[in-house]
């Protein structure tokens, strides 16, 4: 793994940095407190071409033969330093919607759905989770019934969907044969505005307030056969392989959150004076900061390694699970310690470390809980 960033990777990193500093930082506190999903801001981000880093030029991207996964991961990490909600909005579009279409879609599907996602003219989402089917995807109740004309009729709902109600294109999973369990799940591509496809509850979340999360509702939604993604009954495999990539995006988000919290804690420790000297002059605080830095750097290596293995076309399932587990745990520990360094001020929404701590928690949950990452890693060891 080469630790030297290419010129292209540095360009994408700078794009994300400049956007974060100029566009996200000035308004993130207000948008977080008011729970504002800023569509104009997201549209501006998508127009920068960061979504294209992941894909080849053939589909509107910037890569020669499959794009550059690390460039995209660097951008997600950098954006998360400024606004974790915006970072996951990008990650869900690229990792969870565009990527499975690129990996499993037909050329016609790629032309119709992938290209606008890559070019940044449309936003994407991924609908797998249901009220009674979180980790256990085989327990989902959404049904896709095949009609005589070859179309499918979807009925059911999905919850906790990132970009729900904001996205233009959705990857949705439904049971086409309940008797087959996981082998009876099929993936479909749905478009916003399809008759019968509506939105339910908007989630009031602990963190990532600038990301929109909503319920998807399907009532007799007619889906053409050409919108089936992959083969019938292969949806579970598609979902799991998609989540592998999504975990690297979440790990990058967690890394960015942790870095922001550390930067805030370092700065505060230099300014806050107690007992006649800055907090950073107390060994207990300087050691705490050092430990936070060490954890972040260890997590960074795992995240970048997973991204590089995916880029190289090597098996990366376990690497993604490890990176996601470690980076999200580090984010939670680092943000908690940052709040501790701030003391009472850290518990106040007046300072950003409270937001960082709230944002960090979800990284231990979505794209598979951290307990699932242990199952994935342990299963690979014992196989």
From Swiss-Prot:
The active site is at residue 367. Keywords: FAD, Fatty acid metabolism, Flavoprotein, Lipid metabolism, Oxidoreductase. Its EC number is 1.3.8.1. Coiled coil: none annotated. Transmembrane segments: none annotated. One of its GO terms (molecular function) is short-chain fatty acyl-CoA dehydrogenase activity. Gene3D superfamilies: Acyl-CoA dehydrogenase/oxidase, N-terminal domain, Butyryl-CoA Dehydrogenase, subunit A, domain 2, Butyryl-CoA Dehydrogenase, subunit A, domain 3. One of its GO terms (biological process) is fatty acid metabolic process. Has an optimum specificity for 4-carbon length fatty acyl-CoAs. PANTHER family: ACYL-COA DEHYDROGENASE, ISOVALERYL-COA DEHYDROGENASE, MITOCHONDRIAL-RELATED. This is Acyl-CoA dehydrogenase, short-chain specific. It comes from Megasphaera elsdenii.
